[in-house]
Amino acid sequence: MLCTGSNASTIIQEQKHQQDSASADHRSTLLGLETELKKDSRSLLFSCCCLALAWAAALPRASAAARSALTLASAFTLSLASTAAFSVFSLASAYAPALLCFCETFGSLKGYEVENHMNASVTMLEEAIMYSSFSSKKRIRHSSSLTNDLIEEILSRLHSKSVARFRCVSKQCASMFASPYFKKLFQTRSSAKPSLLFAIADYGIEEDYSMKFFSSPQLENTYEKTSSTLVAAAEFHVKFSPDKSIPIYLSEDPRYVSIGYASGLIYNYCGRYVGRPLICNPNTGRYAILPYRYTYRKAYSFFGFDPIDKQYKALSLPYVDGPGRSKVLTFGAGDLTWRNIKSHTEDISYRYYEYVIVCFDVTSEKFTFVGVQKFCLLINYKGKLDVIYWEDDVDIHEICYFAKDLDEYLDENLDADATNELHVWVLEDVEKQEWSKYAYTWTDDTFFHRHLSIAGATASGEIVFSMRKYTSKQPFYVFYFNPERNTLQRVEIQGFGEAFRTTCSVRTFVNHIEDLDVNDLEQLNYIGTRR
């Protein structure tokens, strides 16, 4: 749009009038705060904080980073003012303007920058609450116009492990954090910002098998990003190192160990003669050792969550042509025992399909079957079953069950000159078994085959690929592939650190959310090492 001289002059005058009005508003605010300066030292610091917030909001031309830094400084000043006399809830009430104003500065920041700045703000809030709770024995009640609902809205932005720590601050905190309303609010907040969960297994020393859990923001609609490589920060949760007296086997070999994820919990199942299965909370490190499940031959095991009865279930299936019974273990209520169910092999027909997908209803505990033409990987794609496989010479079935070493097998069988395709089949109708089929050509498929695995799909339908191994000497990447737009976005994950002794195995899970009900599971009796 072109502007004439008179139009430009009018626009300038309007902008000047708006700036004068804003300045007048801020002068009025400052005059009002001047009155507060005469009260006491607590009001002095509080007013200084509000003054900084006012100037933070009055800098439209300043960079987002500068505004964020100023707001953080005012928030820190407010926390200092509160530690002298405020109770925990008074501190949260006073901290609310800083948090709300701080959130408003995120409009021009990228997703991963928002997460990094919010983590810093939340950390400051945690320190202020913990310090104020124990630094003063005498509490001075501070009136606040903020309601309890708004306080809960603010505190619902904390991490689950922070909520677990704050429960010991006071009975009032414990009561609020344990209420169904707050748990639902917290879960809703967490579901709106799912993350990628990384389980990194360190096998540098056989006597010290351990697994470290990290998370990073899960990006959505990455095709809108202009950068060829984005950067996301990884947050450390806990180092999981079970009791050495308990026979648990952690291995990167997919032939012997399966690691599953369901609704916030990790399931680790070992082979026939090694270890015992366990369930672990990657946020807190609490875990439960499950009863030993002996099978005559090799067995498969899977993990799922029943959203109706709110129960976790582990499924154990014997080898298809061998003896044994299918068994289910319910976790979350009652005794931890494996119980027999109808075998899945009784209704399988091999006349029409060489491969069959066995579907298990976690609620009804009944099996259904879907035939496929090729051994493939399964993911949840927008609520539908999605099977993925590569059109090349690599046999996934042979890799999983016959190859002695995955890296050695890939070196011998990958064809660097092959023009391979990624095939994606979406099950549109379960009853009729109708599929939608898609094929995508890759220009650097050897790299994907050699170093990456499919982690799953986001809610927006982007398929996430993650590197299978991590070493501190090389960067770690995840890739977001959008099938609808045929775009690929690379994201570097930073923050794993250099503490790992050797090259480590990495398992990546999508759509990880924090649930306070998971932290309250009574059957998670043990606590893993936190170092």
UniProtKB/Swiss-Prot annotation:
Matching InterPro entries: F-box-assoc_dom_typ3, F-box-assoc_interact_dom, F-box-like_dom_sf, F-box_dom
Describe the location of the F-box domain by residue ranges: 141-188
Q: Which SUPFAM superfamilies match?
A: F-box domain (SSF81383)
Query: Pfam families in the record, alphabetically?
Result: F-box (PF00646), FBA_3 (PF08268)
- Its domain of life? Eukaryota
Alphabetized PANTHER family for the sequence: BNAA05G37150D PROTEIN-RELATED, F-BOX ASSOCIATED UBIQUITINATION EFFECTOR FAMILY PROTEIN
Protein's UniProt name? Putative F-box protein At2g02890
* Source organism of the structure: Arabidopsis thaliana (Mouse-ear cress)
